[in-house]
């Protein structure tokens, strides 16, 4: 079904979901250029939308928002990156702080202008916030859980003016994956769990094309699945790095995934530009594309389960710009070129216990032939449905 009413704008750039909250930010969809689009934050909670359109107007360069993230230890705290205005910190829907070059190690695009271009964000296991800072010398910044900052230079990546570090992923082994889209690079950074000691850090460059069947030129998105594998959305389909704890000891290669469709074997979505990938509670992949709509892919990526586009569904547009999934309800939020949609999937995240177990309908009458929904289960639980006699 659709989420209505929705956010203040139909130009949705990024979506964050945590617990039962969803945060949506506006964006012009300009990937690297300045568009001066006013930023806004919209919150969906308790089946209602709330927003404060003028919340950012008193701050420097509150335009061209890029990403949004909840603090996993405090759902009332939200961080937002901006392609011009650094990083904003929001508490209880109020902007309380802006991080720029004057009050943090974040760097300006000097000498061209004093904009601070930030994009990707991710929290690590110690609740340190990792941020990509483009068009400057040190492309990686860390705001520690203590509030102190750290600035890190990445090898393999030129610090020339204009270089872009876009997205960052912190995986289950606490390694950081940073995308450098313009030069088609993917950097893996391991701080060896000694954040303040830069001398023991290990950095590797992922070889995106040598072991792949399709040569790609640009990385658009990156996500880790429930098996620890890294899925990479590119300009020509999807590639995967099969992750492991000793990954940093060997060369790292990305590979294509074979899928059999209509009797033919081909590389997964090799003709599509992949804009976003979301992993649901069943480890399936929801894949957004630039012009072909939305795909649901099996856990391994070898089977296409469903396809949604303007012709066969209520999808607003075949251009999918961003997605995220509510881990509690399983609702998939889809940002299209024509606005935001919500789709209720049939898979949510496993719970830590059975305290919120729900069955609908309950009781199930003998004449009922529809779907039975069971929610609030633990991961990998076995569910059996019987009649009163067992």
Residues covered by each model-derived region:
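Blade-level signature of beta-propeller repeat domains, shared across WD40, Kelch, NHL, RCC1
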Residues: 237-239, 318-352
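Short glycine/acidic-enriched loop and turn motifs that connect beta-strands
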Residues: 29-33, 85-87, 136-138, 183-185, ...
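Surface-exposed loop and turn segments in beta-propeller and other repeat-based domains
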Residues: 1-8, 48-63, 94-114, 150-161, ...
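Glycine-centered coil/turn sites that cap beta-strands in beta-rich domains
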Residues: 352-384
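Short loop/turn segments immediately following beta-strands, especially the blade-tip
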Residues: 47-49, 92-97, 145-149, 189-199, ...
């Amino acid at each position: 079904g659709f989420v209505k009413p929705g956010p203040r704008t139909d130009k949705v750039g990024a979506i964050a979901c945590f617990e039962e909250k969803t945060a949506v930010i506006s964006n012009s969809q300009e990937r690297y250029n300045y568009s001066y689009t006013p930023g806004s934050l919209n919150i969906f909670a308790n089946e209602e939308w709330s927003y404060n359109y003028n919340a950012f107007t008193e701050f420097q360069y509150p335009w061209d928002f890029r990403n949004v993230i909840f603090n996993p230890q405090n759902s009332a705290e939200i961080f937002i990156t901006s392609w011009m205005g650094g990083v904003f910190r929001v508490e209880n829907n109020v902007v309380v702080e802006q991080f720029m070059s004057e009050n943090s190690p974040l760097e300006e695009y000097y000498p061209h202008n004093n904009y601070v271009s930030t994009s990707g964000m991710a929290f690590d296991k110690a609740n340190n916030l990792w941020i990509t800072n483009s068009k400057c010398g040190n492309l990686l910044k860390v705001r520690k859980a203590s509030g102190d900052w750290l600035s890190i230079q990445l090898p393999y990546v030129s610090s020339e003016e204009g270089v872009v570090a876009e997205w960052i992923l912190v995986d289950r082994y606490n390694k950081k994956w940073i995308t450098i889209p313009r030069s088609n690079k993917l950097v893996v950074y391991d701080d060896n769990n000694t954040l303040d000691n830069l001398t023991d850090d290990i950095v590797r460059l992922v070889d995106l094309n040598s072991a792949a069947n399709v040569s790609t030129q640009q990385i658009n998105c990156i996500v880790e699945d429930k098996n620890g594998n890294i899925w990479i959305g590119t300009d020509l389909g999807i590639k995967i790095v099969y992750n492991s704890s000793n990954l940093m000891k060997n060369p790292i290669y990305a590979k294509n995934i074979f899928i059999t469709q209509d009797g033919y074997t081909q590389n997964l979505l090799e003709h599509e530009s992949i804009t976003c990938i979301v992993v649901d509670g069943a480890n399936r992949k929801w894949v957004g594309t630039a012009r072909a709509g939305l795909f649901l892919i099996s856990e391994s990526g070898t089977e296409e389960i469903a396809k949604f586009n303007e012709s066969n569904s209520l999808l607003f547009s075949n251009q999918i710009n961003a997605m995220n999934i509510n881990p509690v309800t399983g609702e998939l939020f889809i940002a299209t070129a024509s606005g935001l949609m919500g789709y209720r999937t049939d898979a949510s995240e496993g719970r830590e216990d059975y305290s919120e177990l729900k069955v609908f309908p309950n009781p199930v009458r003998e004449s009922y032939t529809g779907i039975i929904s069971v929610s609030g289960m633990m991961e990998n639980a076995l569910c059996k449905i019987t009649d009163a006699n067992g």
